[in-house]
Structure formats: structure tokens, C-alpha cells
């Protein structure tokens, strides 16, 4: 990527329109500042004075008649929109017609604040082929710019302008700028420098205090403002008689400018700080500018960009101004039909319009049956394609490989999986890429396609009617789903996989024997990617590219001038896809390789650790001194004394007595130190142990985490995905160690640029264009076949009229039967309700009309881009049903009564469930309708039919289009979708002769007929003494492949089902175990409850017995008490009798 987001120029260097580019007139040019003056005091004289024009010498300074008209129009518009507080520009002198018309003048750089403000048209979108090739040599980026910018950074010796342009303080002329100052910059571009744009001169613009003021009025779009000439630094440029406007202005160009309405006064575009902007040059013809990167082909874009909304806003603002003016001119009066506040509140909300996607249709606008192409034809077709200097011819052999009778079939599932460079292949690759006898006369290259299955293509790109809404909203263009395996040389250089022909390895005579170059392709593909293409059964020769190579020296030998032919093959690589069982075997092999690698790394790490420990132990043995308590210096030998002194880093020289004294002194010092350390050690031992443990734990955790991350990274590289794919092992040593492989979609390959100026990138881009054209032709032919099979539109109308007449007759008969029957009693009340409902509906319609008046005014001026074909279709249906409205009004009461009886059935009829029955036709339309608008315009569909190479006439195409076109649009969903009730869809196949259009009517050479007659018997070959029909074998092979794919799919479904059943069985077993455990617990609890019951029953019996015993004892006690009481009563009675007797006796 370049420094500025993929472009070589910074943002300020690419702000040019299609007819306006920035180019300095000369080096060292200074633009006079207009910042010092206020917009309120500008006049035409001051503007002319700023431009270097005065009225003292009118003979030398005269404008053309068209310029005078522009100045007068500016004065009129400015007076019309004048305000009381603002002074506008005024024309104070009459300009005369010049004596000589200026035809060719150099362009003048205008500040954008004073230049035209006409809205710039958006880039037109066709097939997104870029600028014409004729201007490629002139579209190189300009090396020098003169502009104004703001200082964003400033250091001691250098600074930056607009964050992109580097300047040194030595390049500053005059006053040193500060951060935020506006400066005039002269910069040059150098791609070899760290900062691509370097300023040669910097000059601070004066009047910085007024640079932040905003203009009070916007300059009208139709006025060309006075021109400010550029001057050199410090020197005022002398005006010249023939360089007043420095632009070619014609009378034809002034007419639309004068007719353009001015912009509103109070709406100002938001400007940056200051009035001066990067200059814009006005020229009569497009000047060479740097080509911007083309937008993606398969993105949602419109042909006219945002012009329509701008025009619509202009019209609405113009109407608002006209209404305000009429209100200001007319006196205040009471409206005769003033709306009441209640009515204002009761107004129904404005109807929300359905959001229609932007119409985007792209296709190649040339005949797609061209078998060859030269330099000029390539330029005309692909204006964005870089063409190598040695190229001179290309043969498009795909036209013969995929004729109209046998087109290419999408939907063959295939995918690639690129392995990491550290992962080695399970099988050793013995293929040779560059043999010593490699001959550059022929090269064979392959383009390997990866594609989803047909069902996935339908669901992901077509938005089928039966799909859920979220899946329909996430559609993708088929060109994004079809992908190719390409080689990558460097960072962004795509290349086709292949190499040069070798006579010793591939065989001789490649021009006669087609199998020679196929062997070359197999060998080179095996060497570069590890893919064995020998399994492929069909090799389609897609294109041949020829280069004229001059004489050169290759590997020390001189190669004469020759023609190199590059053949691009398109094999059926999906036959190389491993089966499910083979894929499982490969997955186990790579897992085993991962285990072996991890074990080898672990052993290696353990061996290194043991060696380090051994080395450390030896060093410790040598360097560790003996403890002082174990030494007796007087009894030691001289050598032992010297070793101990050396281990303690002391001098070992001298006599024995000196050595003894030196060692004794050192031992005493060690003894004292050790005593001190023992005291301190006892205090710090506990703290050190805790710290060591925590540090060791942290190191261990960090080591384990790193090992786990490394293990997961290794597993991601070695573990294969679930779905089978062709494994790719790029040869990292090829192409000077810069080779890699990538899977890129067709849309990405089509989005090439002129900067892709490599020969191998040219081949890939050309193949992408040819493959896209092949798909366009096949899908276009599919549309053509469907149009042929449709009946004429008149037959449809007749059938519809007959069915309508029959329905009317049935309704009339039913109505007569209802009249004969007795009327219900409450019919009158029902009629009254119907009348009330009619009145309410009329009131609502009036309200809707009042609310939609403004919308109707805006919609009257809409052009074809604002035309909604879906609404047009509804309106057409309403016109067709207008005749039935009278009958419906008469039968309204009967229908309403009928609806009350059967409301559910009517609802079902109103919203039928749609189903896509013709998926192939839907995909054909969707390939062109990239934004899924649901329709194709008649002009686009007509051009698509012309590009098919069927040589159809306009009358034939018009007749076909009349079958399906409604108001200049073809709604293809009516052809592909139907309700579930009418799901039985039968297609009438057209004759084979009609499929070829008018090609059979063209004169054919006799040579081709003879070759065709000879080719009829090519399908029969002799093999082992028997005649073999290759065509039938291929058909059987295709059938067997389809059966195999279906069997594998069913097997996969069964495996998935088996896995699900295994999971359910496991869940059932787990639940059974849990239930059995619960059952055991319940039984245990039951046993305990039974034991408790027995204990409680025993206790109950004991209590009952005790209670009975207690009752018996109590009864005996009561009896005893009663007997005792009786005895006492008898004794008391006896005493009473005795006392009575004694009393009577006394």
C-alpha cells in the first residue's frame, strides 16, 4: 500500500474533477491573498484589481463577450438575492467585446472558494472498466504541486504541512510560519524518500488574523468569478494581453450556466480555515490526471450517483423560495378555506414510501463470442488492464471449450486449505519446478476454482422466495462466492500456478500433442503447491497468450528472439477433492505428525537443560571455595593454598609463609561475616522462603501458559477443518523465497488496477475477465431460452380477458340467485352501516389528498432514475382492473357479507406463500441485477441479448422483450416464483436451432465444415482392440460422480445422525444412572421408614397396654374408694340415729 491509503498522492493532490486538475503554471508562483478584505466590501473593481485587471488600459485587458454575459448575470443574481446588512458584488463598468477570440489558452488556477460551485457528477458505473487506454501514458502522477495548506507540526529544523508534506526551515521564504498558519507550498513528489512529498518553498500568507472568517454569501453557481493570476515569489507578474481568462470559453458552454438556478443564500458549505483552498484549473477538455482506483464491480452503486437527490432538493428549495416571495408580495388576508386545528390534528401521517434498492446492473458491452484479441482490442475492452510490452496476441479458446450447447456448470463443490510453512507434507514432493532443459517457447499454467455446492449458491446469492428473511437480506453476488487458488509473489502480486515446458520431463512437440503441456501443468503445480492434478479427467484450454520475446541472455546462454506461448488451463480440480474417509486419514496423519513434533521439541528442551545443568555444576565445582572451618592453613600444601586463594580472588604469588598469612587473614574475615550473616539469616529466612515460593509459582504459571499458547498455535496449524478440502503446501523456496498461495474470489480478481504492472498479474486479470464473460454469456443464454419458451403477450391478454368474463358471468348468476331468495330482516341496518363506511372512506381519501399535494409536486419532475417499477406495476394492475370496479361497487354489500362468512379463507388468498421454481433462471437474472432490485430495465436486457453472439436483429429482440417487459422493466420474479398451489411448473423447451439464434444463417467456410465432419468421429477411439465411445464414458462418469456425491452427502447425514443418536444415548444413560441412584436412595429411605413404622407400632402397643393396665388399676382404686365411702356413710347414719334416740330419751 502507498503512503496515502493506496494512492501515491496525498488527499489534497487528488481533489480534481473530470474537467479540472491542478497544475502550477511555473515554479515559484505565489497566489495573492484575498484574505485581507471582507466579503462585505468586495466589488467587481476590487476583484478585477486582485486579478491584475484595471480599467486604465482597456485595449490590453478585455474579456470576451461570453465573459461579459457571465458578469452581467452575476450582477443580476446578486441584486435579486440582496440583503439589507450585506453589500454584494456590483458591476461598475461595461466590458467591451474583444478584438480577438482566445481559442487556446493555458489554464488558470482558481481558489475553490472563488471557483464554480456546480455539483460534480458522480462516476458513471458500467462494468467498472477504467479510463481509456489511450490516456494511460498521460495518467502518471504529477511530480510537482503548488497549493496552500496549514502548518500542522513544527520542530527545530523541520515541519509538516497538512500532516503529509515535509519541509525544512531552510526552504521558508520570509517570515517563519507557526503552527496553524496558512502557507503557500511548492512541493515535489519523490517515491524513494521516507516522506513522499517534500516542500521546496514555503511562504506564509499575510492577514492570518482574518483567515478564519467565513463568507457571508455563497457565490452563485452560474458565475465565473474574477481570476487571480499567480505571481512569482516577491515579484508581481506582468499581465499579458492574451492571458486574461487563460481558458477556452464558448457560447455553447455559457448557455446552461446562465440557465442554472442559484443556490440558496443561507446555505453555506462548511469550509476549512481560511478562504483559499487548493487551486482548481478549468480547461475545455479533460487534462491528464492520476487515475483513481476504480470502485469494486460488485458493490451497490448507481449510474448517476447523487445527482437526483441534489436536483430534488434544489427543486424543493426553489418552491419554498417562490412561496415565501408570493407571501411577502401579497397582503395578509384571511384564508377562505383555513384548516381548523382539529383537522390539523386529525391529519393522517404521511405514507412511508417503500425503500427501493439502488438499481445496479453491470455487464460487458461487447460481443462475447470473439475468439481472439490483439493489443488494440484489449485496450478497448479492458481500459484498466495493464498490458505487457511484449504481448501481441491472445486466443480465447474457452469459446470452443464451452460452446452454447455445452456451457460450464457451476455448483461443483471444491475447497482449498493452505497449510502453514512449518507444516510438512505427509508425502515427499519430488516434482521439479525449473529443470535444466526448461524451454521458454511454451508455458502451462492452471487456474484452480473453489466453489460452493449448487444449493449453497442458490441460498446465498439468489434470495429464494421460501428462504427466511434474514437469509434473504444477507445475499452475496455469485462472483464473491466463486474463488480461485492463485500464487502470490511478494505482497500483492497474484500469479497463475505453472511453469515452463521441459522436453525431457514432459515430452516433445507441444504444438501437436496437447498432453505435453498438460504434463507440464501437472509437474509445475505439484512442485509449487503439492497438488496432484493427474486425477483430473478434463482439461479445458481456456486461453492462449503470446509474447514476442527479444534476444536475451538466460543462465549464461544467449536465447534468440522467439515467441512465447502461455496456455491457461482450467481443469476439473473438484475431482481431486478427497473423500470423507480419505480426509479422516489425512487428519489423523497430521495429528500424529503434531504429536511427534511436540515430543521431539520436549526431548530437545530436556537435553539442553541437562547439558546446562552439567556445565553449571562443573563451573561451580571449579569456582566454589572451601569452607573456612574445614581449612588449616599451616598444614596445607603450597598448591592447595594457591587454589584456595585463587577461588577467593586473592593473589597466589609469594612464599608459603606469605600465602599462609594471607589465607589465615581471609578466613578470619569470612568467620566474622558468617557470624553476622547467621544473625541476619535467621530473621530473613522466613520472608525469603515465601518470596521464593511466590516467584517460583509465578514463573511456573507463566511457563505453563506459554507452553499452552504454543501448543494451541501448533494445533491450529496441524488440525484440519471438518469439511474435506484439497490441501495446499506452498513451495516457500520458489520465486526467490517469495512464493505463497492465496484463495481469492472472482470479484477481487476483477478489481485490478493499472498499478498491477506485472506480467503474471496481467495473465490472472485477463483470465478473470474471460471467466466473468463466460458466466455472463451462459446466464444471458439462459435468459434467452426462457424468453423463447414464453408465450406471446397477446395470448396472455386473451386468456386473462376470457377468465375475467367467466368470473363476471358467475358473479351475475350468483347475484340473481341472491335476489330470488328472501332478503334478511336486518338488511336495512347493514345498508346504513355501508353508507357510513363509504362516507368515512371518502373523508379519509380527501385528507390523504391534502397531505400528499406536496409529494405530488415533487414527483411530477422525477426522471427515470426516480421511477419505481414496482409502483408502476401496481398502477398497471389498477388500470387493468378499472373495468371491474363498477361490478365490485354493485356487489359490495354481497361481498362484505360473503367476507364475514369466510374471513380466514380470504386472508389466505391475499397472502399466498411464494416458492422459487426456476432457480437457474433466477441466478441468471441475479448475476446481472447486483443489488437485487427485482427487475432489469428494457435497455439493459436488450444489450445483454445483443452481447451473446447470437447475431439477433432488433426486431427479434424486441419481440422477445415484449413478452415480459412492463413499462420498460422486466420483473423476473414473476418468471421464477409462484405460489405453493401452482408449484407444478412445466417449461417448454425450445428447439436447438432457435437456441443458436441467427448463427446458422451465417455463411460458413468449407474448411470448417470438413473439420466438423472429421470431429464427429473423434469421440470413438480404439483401446485394447475395442472401439470406445469417450462421450458416453464421460456422461457415465458424470452420473457416477453425482451418485458418489449424493452417497457421500447421505453418508455424512447418517454420520451426523449417528453422532446425535450417540449423544442422546449417552444422555439417556446418564439420566438412567441418575434415576437408578435416586431409586436406590428412595428404597433406602423406604426401608428406614418401615423400620421407624415398626418401632412406632411397638411403642403404640406398649402405650396401649400400659394405658389399659392403668385403667384397670384406676377402676379398682375407684371401687375401693366407693366401698370406703359407703362404709363411712353407714357409720354416720348409725351415729345420727343414736343421737336422735338419745335426744328423744332426754
UniProtKB/Swiss-Prot annotation:
One of its GO terms (biological process) is positive regulation of cell migration. Residues 1-246 are annotated as: Interaction with AR. Pfam families: BURAN, DBC1, LAIKA, S1-like, SAP. Keywords: Activator, Apoptosis, Cell cycle, Coiled coil, Cytoplasm, Isopeptide bond, Phosphoprotein, Repressor, Transcription, Transcription regulation, Ubl conjugation. One of its GO terms (cellular component) is nuclear envelope lumen. Residues 282-351, 599-635, 671-716, 793-912 are annotated as: Disordered. Its main location: cytoplasm. There is a cross-link at residues 1008, 1063, 1131 (Glycyl lysine isopeptide (Lys-Gly) (interchain with G-Cter in SUMO2)). There is a cross-link at residue 634 (Glycyl lysine isopeptide (Lys-Gly) (interchain with G-Cter in ubiquitin)). One of its GO terms (molecular function) is transcription corepressor activity. The modification Phosphothreonine is found at residues 624, 664, 858. The modification Phosphoserine is found at residues 453, 682, 694. Residues 200-657 are annotated as: Interaction with GATA2. InterPro entries: BURAN, CCAR1/CCAR2, DBC1/CARP1_inactive_NUDIX_dom, EF-hand-dom_pair, LAIKA, S1-like_RNA-bd_dom, SAP_dom, SAP_dom_sf. It comes from the Eukaryota. There is a cross-link at residue 1008 (Glycyl lysine isopeptide (Lys-Gly) (interchain with G-Cter in SUMO1)). Residues 640-1146 are annotated as: Interaction with GATA1. Transmembrane segments: none annotated. Residues 290-331, 338-349, 671-684, 691-716, 793-814, 829-852, 885-912 have a biased composition (Basic and acidic residues). Associates with components of the Mediator and p160 coactivator complexes that play a role as intermediaries transducing regulatory signals from upstream transcriptional activator proteins to basal transcription machinery at the core promoter. Recruited to endogenous nuclear receptor target genes in response to the appropriate hormone. Also functions as a p53 coactivator. May thus play an important role in transcriptional regulation. May be involved in apoptosis signaling in the presence of the retinoid CD437. This is Cell division cycle and apoptosis regulator protein 1.
Amino acid at each position: 500500500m502507498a503512503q496515502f491509503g493506496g494512492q501515491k498522492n496525498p488527499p489534497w493532490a487528488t481533489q480534481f474533477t473530470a474537467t479540472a486538475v491542478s497544475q502550477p503554471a511555473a515554479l515559484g508562483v505565489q497566489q495573492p491573498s484575498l484574505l485581507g478584505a471582507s466579503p462585505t466590501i468586495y466589488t467587481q473593481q476590487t476583484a478585477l484589481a486582485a486579478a491584475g485587471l484595471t480599467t486604465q488600459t482597456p485595449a490590453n485587458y478585455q474579456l470576451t463577450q461570453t465573459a461579459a454575459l457571465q458578469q452581467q448575470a452575476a450582477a443580476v443574481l446578486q441584486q435579486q438575492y440582496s440583503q439589507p446588512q450585506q453589500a454584494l458584488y456590483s458591476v461598475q463598468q461595461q466590458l467591451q467585446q474583444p478584438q480577438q477570440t482566445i481559442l487556446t489558452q493555458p489554464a488558470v488556477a482558481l481558489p475553490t472558494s472563488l471557483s464554480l460551485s456546480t455539483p460534480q457528477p458522480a462516476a458513471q458505473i458500467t462494468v467498472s472498466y477504467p479510463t481509456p487506454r489511450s490516456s494511460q501514458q498521460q495518467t502518471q502522477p504529477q511530480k510537482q504541486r503548488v497549493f496552500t495548506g496549514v502548518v500542522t507540526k513544527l520542530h527545530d529544523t523541520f515541519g509538516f504541512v497538512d500532516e503529509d508534506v515535509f519541509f525544512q526551515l531552510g526552504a521558508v521564504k520570509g517570515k517563519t510560519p507557526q503552527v496553524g498558519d496558512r502557507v503557500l507550498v511548492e512541493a515535489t513528489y519523490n517515491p524513494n524518500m521516507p516522506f513522499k512529498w517534500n516542500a521546496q518553498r514555503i511562504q506564509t500568507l499575510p492577514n492570518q488574523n482574518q483567515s478564519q472568517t467565513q463568507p457571508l454569501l455563497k457565490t452563485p453557481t452560474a458565475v465565473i468569478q474574477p481570476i487571480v493570476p499567480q505571481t512569482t515569489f516577491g515579484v508581481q507578474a506582468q499581465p499579458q494581453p492574451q492571458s486574461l481568462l487563460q481558458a477556452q470559453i464558448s457560447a455553447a458552454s455559457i448557455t446552461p450556466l446562465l440557465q442554472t438556478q442559484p443556490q440558496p443564500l443561507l446555505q453555506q458549505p462548511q469550509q476549512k480555515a481560511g478562504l483559499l483552498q487548493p487551486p482548481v484549473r478549468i480547461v475545455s477538455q479533460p487534462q491528464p490526471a492520476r487515475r483513481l482506483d476504480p470502485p469494486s464491480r460488485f458493490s451497490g452503486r448507481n449510474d448517476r450517483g447523487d445527482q437526483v437527490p441534489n436536483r430534488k432538493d434544489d427543486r424543493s428549495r426553489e418552491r419554498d423560495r417562490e412561496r415565501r416571495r408570493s407571501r411577502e408580495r401579497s397582503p395578509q388576508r384571511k384564508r377562505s378555506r383555513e384548516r381548523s386545528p382539529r383537522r390539523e390534528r386529525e391529519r393522517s401521517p404521511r405514507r412511508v414510501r417503500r425503500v427501493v434498492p439502488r438499481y445496479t446492473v453491470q455487464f460487458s458491452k461487447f460481443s462475447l463470442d470473439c475468439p481472439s484479441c490483439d493489443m488494440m482490442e484489449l485496450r478497448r475492452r479492458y481500459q484498466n488492464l495493464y498490458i505487457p510490452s511484449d504481448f501481441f496476441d491472445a486466443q480465447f479458446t474457452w469459446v470452443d471449450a464451452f460452446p452454447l450447447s455445452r456451457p460450464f456448470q457451476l455448483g461443483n463443490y471444491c475447497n482449498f486449505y493452505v497449510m502453514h510453512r512449518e507444516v510438512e507434507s505427509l508425502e515427499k514432493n519430488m516434482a521439479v519446478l525449473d529443470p535444466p532443459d526448461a524451454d521458454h517457447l511454451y508455458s502451462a499454467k492452471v487456474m484452480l476454482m473453489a466453489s460452493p455446492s449448487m444449493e449453497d449458491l442458490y441460498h446465498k446469492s439468489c434470495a429464494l422466495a421460501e428462504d427466511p428473511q434474514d437469509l434473504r437480506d444477507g445475499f452475496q453476488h455469485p462472483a464473491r462466492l466463486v474463488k480461485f487458488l492463485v500464487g502470490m509473489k511478494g505482497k500483492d502480486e497474484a500469479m497463475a500456478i505453472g511453469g515452463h515446458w521441459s522436453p525431457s520431463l514432459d515430452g516433445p512437440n507441444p504444438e501437436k500433442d496437447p498432453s505435453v503441456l498438460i504434463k507440464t501443468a501437472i509437474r509445475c503445480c505439484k512442485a509449487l503447491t503439492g497438488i496432484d492434478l493427474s486425477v483430473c479427467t478434463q482439461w479445458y484450454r481456456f486461453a492462449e497468450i503470446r509474447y514476442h520475446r527479444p534476444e536475451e541472455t538466460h543462465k549464461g546462454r544467449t536465447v534468440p528472439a522467439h515467441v512465447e506461448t502461455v496456455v491457461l488451463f482450467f481443469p476439473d480440480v473438484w475431482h481431486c477433492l478427497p473423500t470423507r474417509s480419505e480426509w479422516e486419514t489425512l487428519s489423523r496423519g497430521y495429528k500424529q505428525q503434531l504429536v511427534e513434533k511436540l515430543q521431539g521439541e520436549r526431548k530437545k528442551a530436556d537435553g539442553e537443560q541437562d547439558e546446562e545443568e552439567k556445565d553449571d555444576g562443573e563451573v561451580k565445582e571449579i569456582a566454589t571455595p572451601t569452607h573456612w572451618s574445614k581449612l588449616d592453613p599451616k598444614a596445607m600444601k603450597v598448591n592447595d593454598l594457591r587454589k584456595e586463594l585463587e577461588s577467593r580472588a586473592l593473589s597466589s604469588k609469594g612464599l608459603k609463609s606469605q600465602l599462609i598469612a594471607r589465607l589465615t587473614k581471609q578466613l578470619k574475615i569470612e568467620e566474622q561475616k558468617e557470624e553476622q550473616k547467621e544473625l541476619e539469616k535467621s530473621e530473613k529466612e522466613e520472608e525469603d522462603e515465601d518470596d521464593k515460593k511466590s516467584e517460583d509459582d509465578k514463573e511456573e504459571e507463566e511457563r505453563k501458559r506459554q507452553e499452552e499458547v504454543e501448543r494451541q498455535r501448533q494445533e491450529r496449524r496441524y488440525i484440519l477443518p471438518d469439511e474435506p478440502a484439497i490441501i495446499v503446501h506452498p513451495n516457500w523456496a520458489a520465486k526467490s523465497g517469495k512464493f505463497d498461495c492465496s484463495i481469492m474470489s472472482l470479484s477481487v480478481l476483477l478489481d485490478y488496477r493499472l498499478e498491477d504492472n506485472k506480467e503474471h498479474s496481467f495473465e490472472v486479470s485477463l483470465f478473470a475477465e474471460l471467466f466473468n464473460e463466460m458466466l455472463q454469456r451462459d446466464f444471458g443464454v439462459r435468459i434467452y431460452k426462457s424468453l423463447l419458451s414464453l408465450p406471446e403477450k397477446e395470448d396472455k391478454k386473451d386468456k386473462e380477458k376470457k377468465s375475467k368474463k367467466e368470473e363476471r358471468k358467475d358473479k351475475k348468476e350468483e347475484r340473481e340467485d341472491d335476489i330470488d331468495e328472501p332478503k334478511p330482516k336486518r338488511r336495512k341496518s347493514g345498508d346504513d352501516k355501508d353508507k357510513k363506511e363509504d362516507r368515512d372512506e371518502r373523508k379519509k381519501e380527501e385528507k390523504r389528498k391534502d397531505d400528499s399535494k406536496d409529494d405530488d409536486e415533487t414527483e411530477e419532475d422525477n426522471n427515470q432514475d426516480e421511477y419505481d417499477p414496482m409502483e408502476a406495476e401496481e398502477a398497471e394492475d389498477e388500470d387493468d382492473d378499472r373495468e371491474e370496479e363498477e361490478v365490485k361497487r354493485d356487489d359490495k354489500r354481497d361481498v362484505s357479507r360473503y367476507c364475514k362468512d369466510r374471513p380466514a379463507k380470504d386472508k389466505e388468498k391475499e397472502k399466498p406463500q411464494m416458492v422459487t421454481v426456476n432457480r437457474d433462471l433466477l441466478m441468471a437474472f441475479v448475476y446481472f441485477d447486483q443489488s437485487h432490485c427485482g427487475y432489469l430495465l428494457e435497455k439493459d436486457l436488450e444489450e445483454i441479448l445483443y452481447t451473446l453472439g447470437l447475431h439477433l436483429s432488433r426486431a427479434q429482440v424486441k419481440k422477445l422483450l415484449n413478452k415480459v417487459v412492463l413499462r420498460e422493466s422486466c420483473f423476473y420474479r414473476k418468471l421464477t416464483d409462484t405460489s405453493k398451489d401452482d408449484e407444478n411448473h412445466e417449461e417448454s423447451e425450445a428447439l436447438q436451432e432457435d437456441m443458436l439464434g441467427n448463427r446458422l444463417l451465417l455463411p460458413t467456410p468449407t474448411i470448417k465444415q470438413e473439420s466438423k465432419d472429421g470431429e464427429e468421429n473423434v469421440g470413438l477411439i480404439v483401446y485394447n482392440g475395442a472401439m470406445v465411445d469417450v462421450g458416453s464414458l464421460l456422461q457415465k462418469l458424470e452420473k457416477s460422480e453425482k451418485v458418489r456425491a449424493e452417497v457421500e452427502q447421505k453418508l455424512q447425514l447418517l454420520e451426523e445422525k449417528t453422532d446425535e443418536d450417540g449423544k442422546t444415548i449417552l444422555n439417556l444413560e446418564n439420566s438412567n444412572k441418575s434415576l437408578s441412584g435416586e431409586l436406590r436412595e428412595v428404597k433406602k429411605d423406604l426401608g428406614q421408614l418401615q423400620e421407624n413404622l415398626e418401632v412406632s407400632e411397638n411403642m403404640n402397643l406398649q402405650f396401649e397396654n400400659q394405658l389399659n393396665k392403668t385403667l384397670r388399676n384406676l377402676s379398682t382404686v375407684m371401687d375401693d374408694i366407693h366401698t370406703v365411702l359407703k362404709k363411712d356413710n353407714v357409720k354416720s347414719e348409725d351415729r345420727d340415729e343414736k343421737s336422735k334416740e338419745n335426744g328423744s330419751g332426754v
